[in-house]
Curated annotation (Swiss-Prot):
This is Omega-hexatoxin-Hvn1a. The presence of a 'disulfide through disulfide knot' structurally defines this protein as a knottin. It comes from Hadronyche venenata (Tasmanian funnel-web spider). Keywords: Calcium channel impairing toxin, Cleavage on pair of basic residues, Disulfide bond, Ion channel impairing toxin, Knottin, Secreted, Signal, Toxin, Voltage-gated calcium channel impairing toxin. Expressed by the venom gland. Pfam families: Omega-toxin.
């Protein structure tokens, strides 16, 4: 076993031991059960984002300007882009 392999093995071992120790701590037991209902929804809810001007837009409501029009590209193919 060379030095690099030994270092990697020690890091893996330390990580495993740390995870086991964290699971047995009383202050972390049941930590995820406290996230119920609305609190859990807030964690996993996506924040509203909008598509900036000049970017392709699938729907008008996703554009920051709330406006999406067809524009002709160099290939003469019209593409919907945010205004």
């Amino acid at each position: 076993m060379n030095t690099a392999t030994g270092v990697i093995a020690l890091l893996v071992l330390a990580t495993v031991i740390g995870c086991i120790e964290a699971e047995t701590r009383a202050d972390l037991q049941g930590a995820f059960e406290s996230y119920e209902g609305e609190a859990a929804e807030k964690i996993f809810r996506r924040s509203p984002t909008c598509i900036p001007s000049g970017q392709p837009c699938p729907y008008n409501e996703n554009c920051c300007s709330k406006s999406c029009t067809y524009k002709e590209m160099k290939t003469a193919t019209p593409v919907q882009r945010c205004d």
